[in-house]
Regions:
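Extracellular glycan-interacting surfaces
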Residues: 1-323
Length: 323
């Protein structure tokens, strides 16, 4: 049985598949979930970050939740390190927290705020503030950590956050999502004001924008079996992407360094809403849209089918148990 979780405006949606039919349940109803993470060592331990409700943890697959008492309420990003089990949470205003006891206690990683670029961090809709949009612990190295500030840059630490390198050369400053390849330690990927990738564990980045006529990218995911095959969602610009016009959204795939190719195969062309969440697993790919639609591909994006799961905005996706 495959299990999928979606962070939505309604709360956490839990989807379980049996005989190619999805059963849907709503958890944390009305919470306005923004982000999700799972403990790689215990798939029943989940973390949910809420827009204005703090951070919550479940140890029974989402049936029951407790407040983890994070010092900030607006949680924009979560991650659990596969290398050492550390839990990270990023907030608005931009603060980064770490827990080494599964969310029972927290300490702030204050060194992030000592970067020289910090005074320039500013989120355009709320220019007086910014937020930690994405946290990406390297799955092989417990000290290696990438953090994306919206809008401020892509920051890197090699010692678990004790010290930081400021915005990395070649990376996009408007960071929306980051990914490591699960099996190739040095390969990393970014979506934001455009797309970029790294082959040296995030030290430096190369832009990858050729072939896309939509340059405002949002979500990024990578083929677990092929570090040279990755995907982004994109729109014509930030205002259209976030509900102020026709987003003209697409999903693109890049293979072997070739230009980006738009994906169709059953998807509306263009999509009526930006895919806020892309997720590639060992056997499938999912796209969660800003209007609540969920699409699925079983052939690495060549063809797609609607899951007939609809609801509020899907902000994040998490797959477990063979999905």
């Amino acid at each position: 049985m495959a299990r999928l979780y979606a962070a939505t405006g309604d709360g956490i949606v839990r989807l379980e598949e049996s005989d190619e039919t999805w059963t849907v349940g709503l958890l944390l109803s009305g919470s306005g979930a923004q982000c999700l993470a799972v403990d790689p060592a215990d798939p029943d331990t989940l973390y949910a970050g809420l827009r204005q409700g703090g951070l919550h943890r479940s140890v029974d697959g989402g049936r029951n939740w407790v407040d983890c008492k994070l010092p900030e309420l607006a949680v924009f990003s979560l991650a659990v390190s596969a290398a050492d089990g550390a839990v990270y949470a990023g907030t608005e205003p931009s603060r980064l927290f770490r827990s080494d006891d599964r969310g029972e206690s927290w300490r702030e990683i204050e060194a992030l705020l000592e970067l020289s670029s910090r005074p320039s961090w500013s989120f355009p809709p709320r220019p007086w503030t910014s937020h930690v949009r994405w946290i990406a612990p390297n799955p092989h190295d417990p000290g290696l950590l990438l953090v994306g500030i919206e809008l401020g840059g892509l920051m890197r630490s090699s010692d678990g956050g004790q010290s930081w390198q400021d915005h990395r050369p070649g990376a996009q400053r408007d960071v929306h999502s980051l990914a490591w390849h699960p099996h190739v330690p040095g390969r990393a990927y970014e979506a934001g004001g455009g797309a970029a990738f790294s082959t040296d564990a995030g030290e430096s980045w190369q832009r990858a924008d050729g072939g896309r006529d939509r340059h405002y990218t949002w979500s990024v995911t990578v083929d677990p079996d092929d570090p040279d095959c990755w995907y982004v969602s994109a729109s014509t610009g930030p205002f259209a992407a976030h509900g102020h016009g026709d987003p003209q959204a697409r999903i693109y795939r890049r293979r072997d360094g070739e230009p980006w190719q738009p994906l169709g195969g059953g998807l509306p062309e263009p999509l009526p809403a930006l895919p806020y969440a892309l997720l590639a697993t060992d056997s499938r790919m999912f796209a969660g849209l800003a209007d609540g639609q969920l699409w699925e591909s079983r052939d690495r994006g060549d063809s797609w089918a609607a899951t007939h799961v609809e609801g509020e905005r899907i902000a994040a996706l998490l797959a477990l148990a063979g999905a």
